[in-house]
Amino acid sequence: MSAKADERSQAVLRRVAEYVKALGEYDAHFSVVAGDYTTQGRYSVAGDAYHIVVDQAEVYSDGKTRYEVDHDRKEVNIDEMDVNNRNIMDNPTRCFDFVGDEYASMVWTELGENITLLLRANDTVLEGDIYLTVNRNNGRPNRIVYVLYEDRIEVDITSLERRKGAMPKFEVSKYREYEIVDFR
């Protein structure tokens, strides 16, 4: 990776961070393709808190605790939140936060108004590549792809807007009929 390429990709990452920060609390809709599996979902972010809805599952987090609700199995799993995780399906509060020295970055492709960056963790324990596609004009993230060995998860961000209502929060009273498994 050349220093010039790294500077350019870091400038794009800063622009993405500024775009997302300017939204404040926000809602996103997305589609996911992982092998033969295709689905759509949505998530909301307010500071370190988030709420994700995909198929018959919901995930709530207050930034410290993660509550995974499986409506099909009528089960709630409770665990500590991994605040360092940057996977959009695990911690959308940090899924576009790559500014700094934790990830090496370079411009991978450019097509029209889109620019795709290749991101690779500097920590060798964190394997895999991340491809982040953003609008070069305004910094809006459009797509994020996670590649680990033969596995590939593609997430297209179909909408990203400032949140207008109250953030959904986990309420144990809604799940009295569910089995609750606490891993904390």
What would you call each of these model-derived segments?
Residues M81-E113:
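Flexible, surface-exposed loop/linker segments and immediately adjacent secondary-structure boundaries
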Residues R42-D90, L148-I153:
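An acidic-aromatic
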Residues Y43-H51, Y60-R66, L111-E113, V134-P141, ...:
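Short, solvent-exposed coil/turn segments at beta-strand boundaries
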Residues F30-G35, D70, A121-D123, Y146-L148:
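Short acidic, glycine-rich loop/turn motifs
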Residues R8-E68:
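N-terminal mature ectodomain segment of secretory-pathway/periplasmic proteins
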